[in-house]
Amino acid sequence: MESSSVASASSEAGSSRSLEIEELERFIDSYVLEYQVQGLLTDKTEGDGESDKTQSNVSQWTVECTERLEENRTSPRNREPTYSQNGNKEGPLDMLGTDIWAASTVESISGATWDLQPEKLDFTQLQLRQRNSPKHPPPQIDRDGFGKGKRVEGDDINLNDIEKVLPTWQGYSPLPHEADIAQTKKLFRRKRNDRRKQQKPQGGNKQPPSQQNDHQPATAKHNSREHQRQYHGNPPPPHPSGKQGHHGYSQNRRWHHNQKHLPNDLQRNAKETDTLKIEDASVCTVHIPLDIHSNTDSTERHCPPANDSEAKRKESIQSRDRPKISLLQSSKDRLRRRLKEKEDVAVESTNPQKTKMDKLIEILNSMRNNSSDVDYKLTTFMAEAQNSANSEEMLGEIVKTIYQKAVTDRSFAHTAAKLCDRMALFMVEGTKFRSLLLNMLQKDFSIREEMHRSDVERWLGFITFLCEVFGTMRSNMAEPFRVLVCPIYTCLRELLQSEDVKEDAVLCCSMELQSAGRLLEDQLPEMMSELLATARDKMLCPSESMLTRSLLLEVIELHANSWNPLTPTITQYYNKTIQKLTG
């Protein structure tokens, strides 16, 4: 009886083992057949002679990706470590010897060996390594809404309370010293009214010029000449009694609730400027343009009514209490284009007497994303470049010109990516345009940390152009360059972790995710999950600015909508919020 059970157990084990062997053989056959169809297996055997040199010069990008793969295999995610077919777990990531980031740099121009066909690379096994914990970690958020143990009342986050997630615009709590300011203004008004009542019986309906300068514009007794004298900073006539103003204040230092002095008034002294600076900002926020000439009369200006000025005063106090956000000029330009504001750009005409390279530069400078004839200019540039590129050096200069223009002017990045996509297969003496461009991107990616410290504008421009190239350019098989996926995720994560230009970096990350987020998630969804987790932690951190939280909330909501465009109402809400925060 025991022998029969042992025999049946051994037969079952043998049958299961034979099934596993057959399944492994089918997997190996399909693996070999796949690479035979793609033509990569033969290319690998032909390039075995050069594989030693390639592996000895592994680039920084390959090392980083290998480290990420190893750390993710050991990360606590309840995943079993995946082994390759030969059992070797620590082999190099570039199994086919076609690592585009391990190619030579731009300075050593060579032949067609630079075009290593990055569209055939497979990064499906690539994982992201764990993020380094920051010095001051954000508050731990239970994203599921429930703890693993006993739930404590008040620990969860109620997203229905939108005031905790995104600031509203219903006003701010009064400052501690606001009551003192209001009381001081009240005293000044009372003293001023008492002084006017005392002076009315003496002068009747005729008032001295000094009182006319202090009177409100609503009395309709001002003329344009008196307004001109007051706004140009001419000192008022002395008091009839020969005394100074009330409590030692001059006539110009009184609280004027319906008038605004010019910012370029040079006649006032430093004390008067300091005294009126806060009052002018809080009383009247209407700016009236003036043309000041020596022989011309200024037109009569009227301030808004008292109720309008009071509303303006409250709004100005709220804007003064709000932390000021300063953005780079390039970030302001990108926001302006997002909010669909018109941009007037002067375009110079082409001079036929200039050199060929100067003509190409002029065509590049005349291109804009919002111009109607951008396609025509792209075609003109391509024709001019083909006529000019008669050597490898000239082709390298053309690529360098386009690249420098794209990384220094972020508004040109999308147009430059379209131009590079059209000229990708352009070849001179065995050197492709695409290979030179990818090598330039690789070089700047390797020095991105130094670039971040020395030139923030160029750092942001490089990341923008890198994302635009990934979202626009396609390979011969109409697929995106998967070799750029991991560098882009690295750059986007560094944008969220930046501390010196927080708002500019978050704005850049938000806009690139809105344009290329779907494509990035299709290539490596796990890295997108890690990036969005960082974005959520940063959005819920109370130390972040309102602009940062608004931009990140928009990205998270866009991802929840499967990267489809949001409804016009929601889009208009975010646009108005950004206008208020950056205006």
UniProtKB/Swiss-Prot annotation:
InterPro entries: ARM-type_fold, MIF4G-like_typ-3, mRNA_TranslReg/HistoneTransl. Residues 361-562 form the MIF4G domain. GO terms for molecular function: RNA binding. Residues 42-95, 129-154, 190-251, 294-325 are annotated as: Disordered. SMART domains: MIF4G. SUPFAM superfamilies: ARM repeat. It is found in: Cytoplasm, Perinuclear region. Residues 43-53, 65-80, 141-154, 298-324 have a biased composition (Basic and acidic residues). Residues 54-63 have a biased composition (Polar residues). The keyword Cytoplasm applies. GO terms for biological process: nuclear-transcribed mRNA catabolic process, nonsense-mediated decay; regulation of translational initiation. GO terms for cellular component: perinuclear region of cytoplasm. Gene3D superfamilies: 1.25.40.180. Keywords: Cytoplasm, Nonsense-mediated mRNA decay, Translation regulation. Coiled coil: none annotated. Residues 200-213 have a biased composition (Low complexity). Belongs to the CTIF family. Specifically required for the pioneer round of mRNA translation mediated by the cap-binding complex (CBC), that takes place during or right after mRNA export via the nuclear pore complex (NPC). In contrast, it is not involved in steady state translation, that takes place when the CBC complex is replaced by cytoplasmic cap-binding protein eIF4E. Also required for nonsense-mediated mRNA decay (NMD), the pioneer round of mRNA translation mediated by the cap-binding complex playing a central role in nonsense-mediated mRNA decay (NMD). This is CBP80/20-dependent translation initiation factor. It comes from Xenopus tropicalis. The lineage of its organism: Eukaryota, Metazoa, Chordata, Craniata, Vertebrata. The gene is ctif.
